[in-house]
Amino acid sequence: MRRTFVVLLVSLLVITGCSPPPPPAGAETVVLVHGLGRTRVSMALLGSRLGDAGFRVVNVGYPSTRAPMEEIVELLRARLEACCTALDRLHFVTHSMGGIVVRRYLAEYSTAHEGRVVMLSPPSHGSEVIDAFADSPLLRVLLGPAGTGLGTDSASIPNRLGPARFELGVITGNRTVNLINSWLIPGPDDGKVAVDRARVEGAAFLVVPATHPFIMNRQDVAAEVVSFLRTGRFTRRELPDSAGTG
């Protein structure tokens, strides 16, 4: 526990938006994009592990519960232009709604970067949890315009996205601690997104015994992320219960 706290503290000091420390010579850059209602802090441990693996890490924050998707995408574009325009290759690792943000970004700026993308628990085809609660005035305030657009209907933000025209790997969980949400979701889920709704056509796909909020903190997930960024492949199809935490 103490080691994890130290790693997180160091990560917060080192991984600061678009001002990372000098990377190793020849290091490739990975952009981290967090999920709905989260901050850069949620990706700090994963960022530390990617840094240890030799990547230059840029951990991007954005107002996930306040801005519409269009503004979030433009904010991401501006932040990447400020720090990464001279790079030949740029990878992305996302959590939850961050995956939808990056898919929208790459759909509009498809020639900007040539790297790989790993999405953790993305609502690639929406979430039944949004369907159930998006009409609540309180939840609409809490989720914001982008979050309430993550439903499963054909007009939702994720279901209006075109094919992913980049190398993509998806990792999602099949464990839950939110029984109410899971009651709303058919089939295996991670407490927020059904396993089947995380899939993206043509993408490599891996299921792990993890919950939605903490999948990014698993050491075995970080290892699979590194594998995909380096080779375009995961090392296995499914991870055992005993591996990692979260």
Feature map (PLM): residue ranges:
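Alpha-helical transmembrane segments and their juxtamembrane interfaces
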Residues: 12-13, 44, 71, 131, ...
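Serine-dependent carboxylesterase/thioesterase catalytic core
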Residues: 24-34, 40-41, 45, 51-63, ...
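Helical cap/lid subdomain of alpha/beta-hydrolase-fold lipid enzymes
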Residues: 107-246
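Sec-dependent N-terminal signal peptides
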Residues: 4-14
